[in-house]
Design a protein with these regions (language model features):
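Short, low-complexity disordered leader/linker segments with a strong preference
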Residues: 1-35, 91-92, 113-120, 339-342, ...
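Hinge/cleft segment of the Venus flytrap/periplasmic-binding protein
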Residues: 10, 32, 43, 174-185, ...
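Extracytoplasmic "Venus flytrap"
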Residues: 35-62, 72-85, 93-95, 101-105, ...
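Short, solvent-exposed amphipathic alpha-helices that sit
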Residues: 47-63, 150-154, 188-207, 222, ...
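Hydrophobic alpha-helical
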Residues: 55, 88, 100-117, 196-197, ...
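Short beta-strand elements in bilobed, periplasmic/extracellular small-molecule ligand-binding domains
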Residues: 61-76, 177-180, 202-216
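Hydrophobic alpha-helical segments within soluble ligand-binding/sensing domains
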Residues: 83, 142-174, 223-224, 274-278, ...
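Flexible loop/hinge segments that line or gate small-molecule binding clefts
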Residues: 111-149, 168-174, 275-283, 287-288
């Protein structure tokens, strides 16, 4: 009887040891979780949509031996109030880091306060906060590009194109009559792009005359509507269409195509961003040129920052400016080099 009890106890002890070892191995092998909360001003924005898809791929390619990365992506649809609520929801759900494409760059006190209270780092992207806000806390960062550079490059592309294609000056008056499709009322990038492209054209020796500047909110359909109105007003006097982004440049082209304007009366079109559709239009010589906004570089920087911020890793290899800003340079895209960028897309 005693022998039977002793054997039973030995079996139970052995089972407990096995259970303990098994649990210990599970704990060793168990990965830690990183939860990234993302909110965009408008996912219908073509460039933002492409940037987010690239960001998802970059996060998936990170070294995840120790961590599983999950992500929630929300669309503010242009509403800062909605975005504030989304940020609060993701914080309550336990996110480790926030990536925010602001709906309103001048109204982010609620977001920063909520993140600071829970010690959650924020990476703002594409729509740059004002310096005063970003300097409120050492866990606030920005990833994007310099809007002025895009305007300067766009102006240089326009000047080079017109010098090589003097027929753009259809009425032969020595001046280029142009219209601008601007991104958004009061938006920093839109204002800076418009100002810098105008300055760049003048600095590169062009004589120019602005016929109109219309707000189209970065949107292809709105740009088509605005351009249709401008064609009705100015008829064949428009020699150049400058758009703050590719989507609006393509919308302007849509207007001419829908109205059936003869090719000899169609102006030259220039955009910014190098979206998939924009690059295709350059390949087809419908869009004279664009300026490439490096979404791959921005997505990579965002993913690295998010990973390091969430895990407490060293950021010494991040190429910051003023310890907070990561800027990726723009690049000029013409029919001569567009395939280099399209290849990168594939």
């Amino acid at each position: 009887m005693r022998s039977r009890i002793r054997n039973t106890m030995m079996i139970l002890c052995f089972a407990l040891i096995l259970s303990f070892v098994s649990c210990s191995n599970t704990r060793v092998d168990e990965k830690k979780q990183i939860y990234i909360g993302v909110t965009c001003y408008d996912q219908k924005d073509t460039f933002i949509g492409e940037l987010i898809e690239t960001f998802k791929k970059e996060c998936a390619s990170l070294d995840t031996d120790k961590y599983d990365i999950s992500m929630t992506i929300m669309d503010a649809a242009g509403s800062q109030r909605a975005q504030d609520d989304q940020v609060q929801e993701m914080i309550e759900d336990g996110c480790n880091v926030l990536c925010i494409n602001l709906a309103d760059r001048t109204d982010l006190s609620h977001i920063i306060n909520a993140a600071m209270e829970k010690d959650i780092p924020i990476i703002f992207f594409n729509r740059e906060p004002v310096d005063e806000d970003l300097n409120r806390w050492d866990k606030l960062y920005y990833v994007g590009a310099r809007a002025k550079q895009s305007g300067q490059m766009q102006g240089e592309l326009i000047a080079d194109y017109i010098k090589n294609n003097p027929g753009v000056d259809k009425n032969g008056d020595g001046r280029i009559q142009y219209v601008i499709l601007e991104g958004e009322m009061g938006h920093q990038d839109a204002i800076v792009r418009t100002e810098s492209v105008t300055e760049s054209m003048k600095n590169n020796g062009l004589q120019i005359e602005k016929l109109s500047c219309q707000i189209a909110n970065w949107n292809r359909a709105q740009a088509q509507n605005r351009m249709t109105q401008l064609i009705g007003q100015y008829k064949n006097c428009i020699e150049l269409v400058i758009a703050n982004n590719d989507a609006m440049a393509l919308g302007a082209m849509d207007a001419y195509e829908k109205l059936g304007v003869t090719e000899s009366n169609v102006p030259a079109f220039f955009g910014v961003d190098g979206t998939d559709d924009g690059l295709e239009a350059v390949q087809q010589s419908k869009l004279a040129a664009t300026v490439y906004n490096d979404k791959e570089g921005q997505a990579r920087a965002m993913a690295q920052l998010a990973y390091l911020a969430a895990t407490g890793g060293s950021m010494k290899n991040i190429k910051f400016e003023d310890k907070k800003y990561v800027y990726l340079p723009y690049e000029k895209v013409t029919p001569d080099n567009v395939n280099e960028f399209v290849k990168d897309e594939q």
